[in-house]
Structure formats: C-alpha cells, structure tokens
C-alpha cells in the first residue's frame, strides 16, 4: 500500500552521516562497520528500502539550528551558518532530483503527478520519491522577511522549534510561550500559505501558535502523552485541539516516544521487547479521541540521528512500514481507514495547503 511518511531527515543523513542513500540500507551498514557513534552501522532508511516499502512520497527536512547550549548535531553559532547549511541540504535534494531519485512537490499538480506515478501499477524500482520540503526548527531563517526566500525555494512546511531555546520559539523541553518574533514568524507563514508543523513546540508555544495561525496545521512526528508521559508527546487536550483544526498527527517510531521508561543511550529494544505494533496503540488513541481515523498518519523520524538501537526490535528498515496495514486490520480498521492512515489523511492536508 502506498505510504506517505511525514518526517524523514534525508539530507541530514546524506551530509552529516555521509550516507549515499541510493545504496541499500544494509550496504550502508556494512560500510560503517567498525565506526562509532549513535546510529552508526544501524541505519534504517535509504531509497531502495523506501521503494520496496512503497514509501513513495514523504516530507523531507532541512535541519540546521542555533539552539542555546551544545547540541550533538546540526547546530550552529549563527543563523548565517545555519542558513548556509540548509542551502547545502537543498543542493543535495536537487542533486538527487537531477539523478532521477527524487522529485520536489511544490504545488497541487506536482502532488497529483506523484500520486499517479506511485499508483500506476508499474514496478517501483526506479520511481523517483516525491518530497515536500520542510524545515525542522526555524533558526536558519535569518529574519522574518527572509522566510519568503525559503518559500520561493519550495519550502512548504515548517516547525518553528526543535530542542531548547530556539530563535523564534521554545522547544518541547522548555516552558513558555512564543516571543514577539515568533508570533511574527507564524503570521508570515500564514500569509505565505505555509503549513505549520507544531511538533517540538513547548506547550505554551503550541497554544500561542494555534491562536495566531489560521492555515493548515499538522504534527509531522508526534505521539501521545497519555501513553508516554513526556512533554515531547501531545496531551489529549492538545490532540483534541488539533483534531478541531482538521490536523493530522504523524506517528513516530523513535523508541523513547513509543513506550514509557525508555532511557536513551541505555535501553535497547531487546531489553523491553518493543514491537512495531506498539505504534498502533498511539494511532488508536488518537482515533478514539477523534471518533474516526481521519487525524492520524505516519511520521516515522526513522533516520533522525539514530538507528536500530532506538527502534522496535522487529523493524529492520523503513520497508517494514508495509506491515502496519495488517496490524490495523487486526484492530478492526476498515480498508478505507487504513488507506487514510497510510497516506490519505496527509494527502488531504496537502491538497488543502497546496491549492
């Protein structure tokens, strides 16, 4: 079944981890054998596995922050440096387009063309992967007026924060609302028609942003606080607010977001027997709050700076997303519900935003 993944850090992996994503994931692991570092030799995501799992369309990020305090990856001392990093990431996406492996989706016509390509019944082996460009954390936007330049480059979604104190917002691990420039940024996103990604926002920033922003909203990779008590997840009150706005939440496969008590860098999937099917618990929780299956989708974050040491033990690569439809069917979800979760709900929001 065609799958839309609402959050992949593809360019981060290509440039920060030096991974040629045209190669199979297992070949990338082989090449990293003997190297050290989080996620090294354990990557799950590459183009061949995306094609095999029918992950034909995705949201692909740019990521370069100026977050206060040291961060292990993609964090810079100035917005100018961060902007330059995002431009390098954009250049990589363009190089993959020129090589026939990706195709950027900027408008409704582009979206419909990619959906048609991936549902034409032909083999997927050589199909380009369609991507909607998103920015995870707005620190690289040098000024509010600078956002339009990113829009012209095809940026269609953005989350104002990542971790900690960011230039325009506070991350989920902080307490407080949007500063004045953050409110201006959200207003400019609204004017341009950009999608607001509320993932990673502090609770205060979340509520401020929803009050200001009138356009299309999603949470690209967020799970349920009722199941995993942590500010990184959304409370039922927040989920209900997103449902009332017609939003969709992408379910993430980062292990510490799936079950309570996970200690990053210490707990291993085999220690707690974490299975892929646990993500259906989060999906079902959102569906129960909504009374339907119209507000949840897939947003794996599978390549977000970690690997199989921080994913379900029965997940080898992103191709395993193809097992989720059967898991949903066993829970009583209809074929239409499953199609909506795997791709239809996010497609609906994209059609709304890209019209």
Feature locations, PLM:
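Loop-centered beta-sheet repeat module
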Residues: 175-211, 216-221
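Histidine-centered catalytic micro-motifs
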Residues: 3-10, 201, 219-222
């Amino acid at each position: 079944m065609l799958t839309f993944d609402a959050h992949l850090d593809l360019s981060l992996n290509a440039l920060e981890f030096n991974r040629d994503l045209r190669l199979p994931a297992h070949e990338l692991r082989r090449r990293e054998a003997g190297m050290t570092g989080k996620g090294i030799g354990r990557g799950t995501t590459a183009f061949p596995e995306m094609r095999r799992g029918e992950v034909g369309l995705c949201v692909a990020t740019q990521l370069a922050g100026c977050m206060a305090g040291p961060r292990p990856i993609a964090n810079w001392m100035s917005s100018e440096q961060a902007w330059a990093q995002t431009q390098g990431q954009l250049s990589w996406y363009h190089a993959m387009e020129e090589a026939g492996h990706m195709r950027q989706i900027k408008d409704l016509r582009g979206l419909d063309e990619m959906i048609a390509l991936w549902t034409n019944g032909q083999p997927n082996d050589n199909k380009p992967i369609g991507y909607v460009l998103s920015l995870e954390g707005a620190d690289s936007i040098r000024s509010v007026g600078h956002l339009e330049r990113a829009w012209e480059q095809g940026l269609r979604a953005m989350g104002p924060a990542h971790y900690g104190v960011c230039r325009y917002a506070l991350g989920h691990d902080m307490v407080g609302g949007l500063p004045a420039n953050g409110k201006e940024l959200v207003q400019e996103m609204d004017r341009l028609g950009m999608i607001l990604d509320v993932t990673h926002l502090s609770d205060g920033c979340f509520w401020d942003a929803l009050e200001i922003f009138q356009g299309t909203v999603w949470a690209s990779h967020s799970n349920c606080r009722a199941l995993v008590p942590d500010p990184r997840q959304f409370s039922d009150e927040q989920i209900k607010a997103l449902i009332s706005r017609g939003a969709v939440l992408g379910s993430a496969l980062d292990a510490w977001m799936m079950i309570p008590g996970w200690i990053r860098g210490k707990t291993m999937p085999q220690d707690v027997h974490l299975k892929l099917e646990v993500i259906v618990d989060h999906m079902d929780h959102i569906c129960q709050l909504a009374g339907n299956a119209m507000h949840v989708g897939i947003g794996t974050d599978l390549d977000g700076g970690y690997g199989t040491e921080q994913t379900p033990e029965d997940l080898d690569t992103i191709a395993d997303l193809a097992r989720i439809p059967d898991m949903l069917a066993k829970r009583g979800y209809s074929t239409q519900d499953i199609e909506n979760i795997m791709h239809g709900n996010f497609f609906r929001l994209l059609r709304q935003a890209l019209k």
